[in-house]
Amino acid sequence: MTDGEFRLAYVPGVTPGKWAGVWAERVREVPLRLLQIPATEVVPLLRNGGVDAAFVRLPVDREALHVIPLYLETTVVVVPKDHAVAAAEEVELADLADEDVFEPLDEVLTWDDRPGKPAFTRPESTAGAIELVASGAGVLLLPQSLARLHHRKDLTYRTVTDAPQSQIGLAWLEAVTTDLMEELIGIVRGRTPNSSRGRNPQQQPTRKKPPKQRPASKHRPQKRRRR
């Protein structure tokens, strides 16, 4: 943390707005600064102290880092709207065997056996690969979040059911697990403000219930007879 703010990096495709909103409600005294950082740069930036925590795409080098895996992303294939794949609701890798598949230099998926045929070039970025797909030169496989980020009206995408998936995680330095970091972990994991693992939950003192009072007797006292 620096200058009274908590710096949270995130890789393209991650949408931290919901968590940022919860932070603003719970940690009003410390602003949350969001920084979108390329996937290849985010871990070095974290190690150098440029940010306090980061949403990263796994796997990453975990040396000196704490990493919490959060969720898996659906993998899709991006194609022109008039492509044959667009007629299906979802496809398998075998359906792409005859396709020219782009592999950008900032590829985020890990492949044992890449489908299709290598395209004629390796674009420097996912954005560049999207441009080439729009020209009809090939197709591109990537997480659905990135397909949405690079949305174009002339392109569409379909789920690839048996493709490897990208996983998003929350990372921070092992040596810097602060109260604010614990607060962020709680927010991301959906803990309530008064969770026992929260930063400083305010506990209300237990109030003892007052003793129950017996209802007054309905019988009137009998008058003493005069002798």
Where are these regions (language model features)?
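Secondary-structure junction motif
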Residues: G17, E89-R122
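Short beta-strand-centered segments that line the small-molecule binding cleft or hinge
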Residues: V22, T40-T75, L155-R158
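A late-sequence structural motif
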Residues: K18, R158-K208
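Short alpha-helix C-terminal cap/hinge motif
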Residues: T2-L8, P12-Q36, P44
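Short helices/loops that flank or line small-molecule/ion binding pockets
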Residues: A24-E25, L35, A39-V51, T126-A137
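A ligand-binding cleft/hinge motif common to bilobed small-molecule-binding domains
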Residues: F55-L65, T126-L155
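Short, well-ordered beta-strand segments
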Residues: E5-V11, A54, V78, F102, ...
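Flexible hinge/capping segments at coil-to-helix
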Residues: V67-T75, V79-V101
